[in-house]
Regions:
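Acidic, metal/ion-coordinating pockets
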Residues: 1-250, 294-298, 304, 445, ...
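Glycine- and acidic
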Residues: 8-11, 285-288, 436-437
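Feature captures C-terminal
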Residues: 17, 326-465
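Structural signal for hydrophobic packing residues in well-ordered secondary-structure cores
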Residues: 27-34, 161-164, 168-171, 192, ...
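Residues in well-ordered beta-strands of folded domains
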Residues: 104, 219, 316, 393-395, ...
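Amphipathic, soluble alpha/beta structural segments
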Residues: 116-132, 151-154, 176-179, 183, ...
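A broadly conserved detector of short glycine/acidic/proline-rich loop/turn motifs that flank catalytic sites
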Residues: 137-140, 222-224, 237, 319, ...
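A short C-terminal boundary segment appended to hydrolase-like catalytic domains
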Residues: 237-330, 462-464
Length: 465
């Protein structure tokens, strides 16, 4: 007898609910169809469902996301870095308390005491006809952040090696839910032939028909749930083995919306708006925001960052603020709207030479006009860099490009060999936006505060009537 086993999955929604009601309708329909046919079917999420960029996620600290997943009927989920490092310890500890699905993450640990009751290292599920399926999941080890929040992520390869032998002995099939990224997924497939399926996320890769590496089929469905993934396994009960593994992703953006989900989203948005409608200050004058110009609010915010982190200098890009603020009542919702990024303050150590190179790079048209989506940045462009504690003099070339002619502190040039503590947005410590910052061997992150928390303090101190 041949038995088909079905998995449907989502990954990296990032609280982008544009297509969520379509996702809900598609998944509920698929599950109902398989239940009618008496076929085994599970719904999975691979992490980063929560992202505090959205007011619903911000107001409910992720709890509304769990309600939405319950409504769809998810069976299993794992933790992404956006759940893991953007929520305070207590909020994450209780995030899944009301989940009607099992949460699996074998390398996630609480360093402050007992583990959350919802946390499973592995899970075993069973098909209608008795095929035992072992589920293991891992999340990306951003311990520089996690440890500041009272969590620890153990090394992925060591964790897999620890649990995979046990699963191999007790189950027929092993499914790995990976919030590690495509490169890690491929390497894990090469190292661990025991894995049959790797369902991935984190790096927002889209594999339309899956990819076979060693013994595993690897799959992932991009980001924001424009696609939903499906894995179909065929088990031969006579031969007692898998004889076929298939993986597909389906574009759901053209499908009809599930009206019940639409109503729930509207209800949650109204409630979130009410919760965020808490007055922060009253402003007598409107606040001007410009991405490519020096503004008072960006200068004040950069000054606050310098003082708050006790750094010698500070730098922030003007693109962090997305919109103007009118005169009158300013709520936390307004602050979230103009500064929605899950970005934390950070202090790095740079030599005088390195800092000057960073400053020069920041004034290039290429960086200022860079369209960025990622590293926590949820805006449009990087914009002009604003400095505190430094005087940066620039001139314009005949071609219209601006260049840095002089950098001083209290009228004196920077010592090229001296190390300075520079406060900035943590997004510059990732990737290659500003290589000197990314390569700094000394990085101190501040959690759970976001830059918008410093913005609220700045507005209270400098702009309140």
């Amino acid at each position: 007898m041949l038995e088909k086993i079905y998995f449907y999955y989502t990954n990296d929604l990032h609280s982008d609910f544009e297509h969520w009601s379509r996702v809900a309708g598609y998944l509920k329909g698929a599950k109902a169809n398989h239940n009618t046919k008496n076929e085994s079917c599970w719904l999975l999420d691979i992490g980063d469902h929560v992202d505090r960029v959205h007011p619903i996620a911000e107001a409910f600290m992720g709890q509304a996301n769990i309600r939405l997943m319950n409504d769809v009927g998810y069976d299993l989920a794992t933790i992404g870095n956006n759940e893991g490092i953007t929520l305070a310890h207590e909020d994450l500890f209780h995030l899944y308390d009301k989940a009607n699905f099992q949460v699996v993450c074998a390398n996630f640990h609480n360093v402050q005491g007992k583990e959350p009751e919802w946390l499973n290292t592995t899970v075993t599920i069973q098909s209608i006809n008795g095929v035992k399926i072992g589920i293991i999941a891992l999340t990306a080890p951003f311990n520089a952040f996690y440890e500041l929040l009272g969590w620890y992520i153990s090394p992925p390869y060591n964790t897999l090696a620890r649990y995979i032998k046990e699963l191999e002995e007790s189950t027929d099939v092993i499914v790995f839910m990976s919030h590690l990224g495509i490169n890690e997924d491929q390497e894990i497939a090469r190292r661990f032939p025991q894995l049959d399926v790797i369902i991935g996320g984190h790096t927002h890769h889209l594999l339309r028909q899956g990819e076979i590496v060693n013994n595993a089929v690897i799959t992932a469905a991009g980001k924001h749930c424009a696609f939903v993934g499906e894995v179909i396994l065929t088990w031969d009960h006579s031969a007692q083995k898998l004889i076929k593994k298939e993986a597909y992703t389906t574009d759901i953006t053209h499908l009809e919306k599930d009206q019940q989900t639409e109503e729930t989203l509207h209800e949650l948005f109204v409630e979130a708006t009410t919760q965020l409608d808490q007055s922060v200050i009253e402003m007598k004058h409107p606040l001007d925001v410009q991405w490519f110009e020096h503004t008072e609010v960006m200068q004040r915010l950069t000054n606050t960052l310098k003082e708050w982190t006790n750094a010698e200098f500070a730098m922030l890009n003007a693109g962090l603020l997305l919109d103007h603020l009118p005169a009158g009542k300013v709520t936390y919702g307004d602050i979230h709207r103009i500064c929605p990024h899950p970005i934390n303050p950070c202090v790095v150590e740079l030599s005088g030479d390195e800092l000057v190179e960073v400053i020069r790079a920041s004034f290039t048209k290429e960086l200022m006009e860079l369209t960025l989506k990622g590293f926590g940045f949820r805006g449009e462009v990087i914009g002009r860099m604003i400095y505190s504690g430094l005087t940066v003099e620039t001139e314009f070339l005949s071609d219209g490009n601006e260049y840095v002619s002089k950098v001083t502190c209290n009228g004196e040039p920077l010592d090229p060999n001296k190390n300075y503590l520079v406060a900035t947005a943590d997004m510059f410590t990732f990737g290659r936006l500003l290589p000197e910052i990314a390569r700094s061997k000394t990085k101190k992150y501040f959690l759970p505060e976001f830059l918008r928390d410093l913005l609220a303090d700045t507005l209270r101190k400098s702009f309140s009537t």
